[in-house]
A protein has these predicted regions:
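Eukaryote-biased activation of long, low-complexity terminal tails and linkers
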Residues: 1-536
Length: 536
């Protein structure tokens, strides 16, 4: 969304319909920086959204904003769904329990996704207020100690669904887990070596569990162990999704270990009674085992021929039909059997020149949404042109190169009518004024909505905004500014946000505010201080 449209919605429409809106989502990222602050500048608070049932907040980096939002939610008496996604706070003085207690005090809240990461605070604080309504809770970015699960349920006594990262090996052994009879769905993950008996003690207290999703890194339970756990403690379980990984030492035989694991999941319990099939994937000395109903994300590191399954209908082609992302640009450099096809690629990183076998393996790019071309040089222009011509749904094009080219002229000749995002920040070149003009008038430039680029003259920013009529967001690095170097020194590797006096010396920001329309929002990129974000 452009800032012009967002301004219009906030100024003209929201005041008239605020009392009828039932769902609202606000997000702060590179394309919409400071969106929530801007929202508050127009509407001051959420108090007018009296019918609001669902509120989603994404990417907030301000503790004060989060406290303000959770305070105002007390007045939203119909709010049942609250989602905080990808919120990251560098302020280690932030009062984590205050945020949690605010949320637990909402009278009708049923569903909460809590993804708030506060620097230096690993563990989720147990609330001190009782929620009589919360039934579904997902916690990301922080960990829950096993011995505190009792207390979580004491303050969330209607909880039916829970998704958490658990630390099973905490030091407190002087506790007995209570029964959790309300719980019917559980998603647990553990990213360290665990005491298996403690995980079993959790599961044996969930007698009404119907859905279980388990992710274990550095831990393995074989099929016999899982069968015993389910039969003894989870009589009502209907859906079971499992993901585990184990890294072997160099003197261990990985093929024998895989055979042992696969065979342990071949009993009638797995195959006949439940039809819960598992798949084993070998990556060097690491074994990934997961139920075929669970998504495995590290596709592009998988060597062909290293897949085993208990499903008689499973095969390598079925596995690769589900592959939608390749972010390893050397993926096609490995030997690939000629019968393998990858028909559903949506996100692709590829290094030029394209391997000879690429087009036989990838027969169609009709679903390709994002393309990153690595080591681009003019010699391979025809290959890039072919990629673009065969990708009718491509939205994002990113071009990276290690060494600068003598000329950028060929870049301006490429075309694809569906591309709306152009990322040249790793192009290893500062575009001069003439090149920026050519880019603005090129086919890709005219249709571009989101542009990331390095330039050597700040005047080109003005030209981009005037001439690229569809542009709504700029992520730009300017060679003729020195502010970010001083800013990096001011941070000294410790503080994420600079001293206010340093911020006030940001000459380029001030220059842009003086020369661009006042409707543009101009800020430093919080993730890359040498880039400036302009929301148009």
């Amino acid at each position: 969304m452009s800032k012009r449209h967002f301004d219009m919605i906030c100024q003209r429409h929201l005041p008239l319909i605020a009392d009828r809106i039932i769902g609202l989502s606000l997000s702060e990222h590179e394309e919409t920086p400071k969106q929530i602050n801007l929202f508050y500048s127009y509407l001051l608070s959420f108090n007018k959204f009296i019918q609001l049932r669902s509120l989603s907040i994404n990417g907030v980096r301000s503790y004060k904003i989060l406290v303000k939002i959770t305070d105002e939610c007390h007045h939203l008496y119909n709010l049942t769904h609250l989602n905080f996604y990808n919120c990251s706070l560098e302020d280690n003085q932030a009062d984590f329990p205050l945020l949690v207690n605010n949320i637990w005090s909402f009278s009708k809240l049923v569903h909460c996704n809590f993804s708030i990461d506060i620097k230096g605070k690993k563990f989720f604080p147990i609330p001190k207020k009782i929620s009589s309504s919360l039934e579904r809770l997902s916690i990301y970015g922080s960990t829950l100690k096993l011995h505190e699960i009792n207390r979580l349920f004491e303050y969330t006594n209607r909880l039916k669904s829970l998704s958490i990262n658990v630390e099973f090996d905490d030091d407190n052994n002087n506790y007995i887990l209570s029964l959790f009879p309300t719980l019917i769905e559980l998603h647990i993950s553990c990213s360290h070596q665990l005491d298996i008996s403690k995980m079993i003690s959790l599961l044996q207290n969930t007698p009404n569990l119907r859905r279980l999703n388990v992710s274990l890194w550095f831990n393995f339970l074989d099929g016999h162990q899982w069968e015993q756990i389910i039969c003894n403690y989870l009589p009502k379980l209907k859906i079971f999704r499992l993901g585990m990984e184990e890294t072997l030492s160099f003197d261990q035989n990985i093929e024998e270990r895989v055979d042992e694991l696969i065979n342990s999941f071949r009993s009638s319990f797995w195959i006949d009674e439940h039809q819960w099939f598992v798949r084993c994937i070998i990556q060097k000395k690491t074994i990934h085992l997961y139920t075929t109903s669970k998504i495995f994300y590290n596709y592009d590191s998988v060597l062909f021929g290293s897949i085993r399954s208990t499903d008689p209908q499973d095969n390598q082609q079925k596995f690769y039909n589900n592959m939608t992302s390749i972010v390893n640009e050397t993926f096609f450099d490995q030997p690939i059997p000629s019968y393998i096809r990858l028909p559903n690629i949506e996100y692709l990183w590829i290094k030029l020149p394209i391997n000879d076998q690429f087009w036989s393996i990838v027969p169609s790019l009709n679903r390709l949404n994002s393309l990153t071309v690595v080591s681009y040089i003019d010699t391979f222009q025809s290959q890039l042109k072919t990629l673009l011509n065969r990708a009718p749904c491509l939205r994002r094009l990113c071009i990276t190169q290690d060494a600068p080219l003598h000329s950028q002229m060929l870049l301006f000749r490429y075309a694809n009518p569906s591309v709306r995002q152009l990322d040249l920040r790793d192009y290893n070149h500062y575009f001069n004024k003439e090149e920026c003009i050519r880019l603005s008038h090129s086919s890709l430039g005219r249709q571009c909505e989101v542009l990331s680029i390095m330039i050597n003259n700040r005047e080109s920013i003005i030209y981009f905004i005037k001439k690229m009529i569809n542009l709504r967001s700029l992520n730009i690095r300017c060679e003729d500014e020195k502010y970010y170097k001083g800013l990096a020194l001011a941070k000294n590797g410790n503080n994420k946000y600079p001293d206010e006096k340093i911020q006030n010396k940001d000459d380029l920001i001030q220059w842009l505010k003086d020369h661009l329309p006042s409707t543009c929002l101009i800020v430093r990129n919080p993730h890359w201080i040498n880039y400036i974000l302009i929301w148009i």
